[in-house]
Amino acid sequence: MALSTEQKTKMWAMLNQTRGQIGLTAYKDYIFGILFYKYLSEKATHWLNGVLRGENWESVYSQDSVKALNYMKKNLGYAIQPNEFFVDWKKAIDTDRFNIGMMTDTFTHFNQQIAFEAKNDFEGIFDGMRFDSADLGANAQARASVMISMIELLSSPEFDLSGSNDTVSDIYEYLVAQFATVLASDMGQYYTPKEISNVMARILTFGREDMEKFSIFDPTVGSGSLLLTTASYMKNSGRRGVIKYYGQEKDATPYRLSRMNLMMHGIEYNDININHADTLESDWPDGVVDGKDTPRMFDAVMANPPYSAHWNNKDREDDPRWREYGVSPKTKADYAFLLHCLYHLEDNGRMAIILPHGVLFRGASEGRIRKALIDKHQIEAIIGFPEKLFLNTPIPVCVVILRKNRIESDVLFVDASKGFEKIKKQNNLRSEDVEKIVDTVIN
């Protein structure tokens, strides 16, 4: 069951009450990390209850610890030793036995027990938490006090993760949105408003909702919201193996958050492949291997890249991602991101990318790239949105829809700049605005 507005408001108020003097920028890493560990603990407990059939995990572990941990790793991708579950921290607090070293030991052991095939999914995922950090307090006692407050907060009924995946994902999505709102300059760039995500996702999946296999790719994955929203419109998204989630992220914080976000939506680690690297540097996934151009292709590609970013465009003319179209200027990487996405699109796939309006009229190399895309009939539609939809920038943006093997030469322009509601300093798309945009594009 989805969280009510009242529950969300209470949750955020409780969180602010417990953080004390810690800045939200630092606090978010601990809240997300500990919440995710709680999720993994409860998932492991649920799995153990099903396989042990009344036996005690500590007893099984004591008989053959290596075998026990390997069995858990084989099934979950990770393993948790006895007495190192989230509830064990809470029990230690309740009996005055807690110390911050318990958490340090837990995460050290967790990192040692990641399955080889799950390394990309779990490795470094808790690195945002430093238990010796001065952000938490001047001494071990002060830092332990902060951790106790967090653990007790996340043990409250408001943060109960024992319900459906919808409840778990709702909690996580709400917190991501709240932190992105409050920390707009820090996190806003990694968060795409839900309404724009829905527009893109519905266009990308229209007529393909029943596909048994579907691969999606976001090369600037941020919090992972575009991947998740796109998948939510696929009828078989709840079945393991149907959808393969690929993404890439340069910055460490969203790299961690995106993996947490996907898994807390119930997606198994072996359906997730998120890479930590600069998308505009060496190509991924696959790309040129042993001198041969062999990019991995996807059914749907979506992106909300940093707008008009600077990049190193030197000696890029022979890179297969840009060779046919040209190289973007070093002060504006917008078309570099677009062409990277197009390069990884299946011949019958669809892509949607959010860009500043400047890509529609700037000249020089960008004008030549734009002309090449139009001459190849690869731009299907351009949707112009109102200003102030995004948390980190007031500028208006557009969504460009592309297909590779398109025959029609026309380009649909949708002016959606007038349909919105104003909420404080931000503009928001209403449900009727989303419907009108989607209907215009797909019909």
Question: Each predicted region: which residue ranges?
Answer:
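S-adenosyl-L-methionine
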Residues: L257-D293
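Non-catalytic, mostly N-terminal accessory regions of nucleic-acid modification and defense proteins
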Residues: M1-L204, R208, N270-T279, G384-E387, ...
